[in-house]
């Protein structure tokens, strides 16, 4: 930085760990998935017959063992949800993982072994797979984006473009893929975006500087980030003491000019229209951060199977 920054770069490149997630909240998500499957939760008219009518035909008290297997190369994520899901259906099943979240697996690799009540295993298998396939898809796609940046000093961040109620899981998956987490919600950073500036009548000039300065002075212990969509907004943002300047939908030449203008007076972040193909060029510009929600909202579920042993 060209001046004494209020916050180090490390402040803005954190990763959610599994222990950061609230187990009670995760149990609620699993519980919703369970009653959706067994009792038609979400339907205005609940079914008269509840439960798993197919598994009810299986031998009572039967025990079983099954293997979780990667059916294609992937970065695994969500293993902590497997035991939580089993326990939601019953107390007599065990999951023994042979991989760990964030690990890259090849086709055919074993992820873990499920054992216990056949009834519980049969009822829970689709919910388990839904979580693992989705979160592993996010982690795998994120890994591709991180790899595309290569040895660049630019740090890949996620966004708040997440499925409602699943944010912490999707951000955790992004971290498992090697990315870093942007703000978790509206509570942990002041982020003046274009609509905030429009409401404040502060899209440029002195009014823009005054609005940013008010945020910096009022929120002394909270980082202040400002989204700009023109080069002309950069100097007022710098003069007001913004901690991070988000360069929204700038072209490559504009980004290069913006980095030169900012000259280390604030941390820089590029966002908008970020693709795998553009990352190598973006990584050469000297940007501090590159943020994209694509690995979360454009990822494909990965093929994972549960096979009876």
Where are these regions (language model features)?
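Acidic/glycine-rich phosphate/pyrophosphate-binding loops and surrounding catalytic core
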Residues: 2-225, 229, 233-240, 244, ...
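Active-site loop ensemble at the mouth of alpha/beta enzyme cores that anchors a bound cofactor
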Residues: 305-309
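Short secondary-structure boundary segments
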Residues: 249, 272, 294
């Amino acid at each position: 930085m060209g001046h004494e920054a209020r916050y180090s770069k490390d402040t803005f490149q954190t990763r959610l760990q599994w222990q950061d997630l609230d187990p009670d909240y995760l149990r609620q998500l699993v519980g919703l998935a369970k009653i959706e499957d067994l009792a038609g939760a979400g339907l205005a008219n609940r079914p008269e017959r509840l439960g798993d009518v197919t598994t009810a035909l299986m031998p009572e008290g039967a025990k079983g063992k099954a293997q979780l297997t990667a059916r294609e190369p992937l970065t695994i994520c969500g293993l902590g949800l497997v035991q939580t899901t089993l326990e939601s259906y019953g107390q007599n099943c065990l999951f023994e993982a042979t991989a760990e979240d964030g690990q890259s697996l090849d086709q055919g690799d074993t992820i873990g072994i499920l054992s216990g009540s056949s009834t519980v295993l049969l009822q829970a298998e689709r919910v388990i797979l839904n979580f693992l396939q989705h979160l592993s898809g996010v982690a795998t796609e994120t890994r591709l984006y991180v790899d595309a940046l290569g040895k660049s000093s630019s740090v890949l961040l996620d966004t708040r473009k997440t499925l409602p109620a699943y944010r912490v899981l999707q951000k955790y998956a992004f971290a498992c893929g090697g990315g870093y987490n942007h703000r978790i919600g509206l509570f942990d950073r002041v982020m003046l975006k274009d609509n905030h500036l429009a409401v404040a009548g502060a899209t440029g000039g002195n009014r823009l500087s005054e609005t940013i300065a008010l945020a910096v002075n009022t929120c002394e212990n909270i980082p202040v980030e400002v989204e700009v969509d023109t080069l002309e907004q950069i100097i007022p943002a710098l003069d007001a003491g913004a901690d991070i300047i988000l360069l929204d939908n700038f072209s490559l030449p504009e980004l290069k000019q913006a980095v030169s203008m900012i000259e280390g007076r604030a941390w820089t972040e590029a966002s908008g229209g970020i693709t795998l193909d553009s990352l190598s060029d973006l990584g050469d510009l000297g940007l501090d951060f590159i943020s994209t929600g694509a690995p979360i909202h454009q990822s494909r579920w990965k093929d994972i199977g549960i096979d009876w042993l």
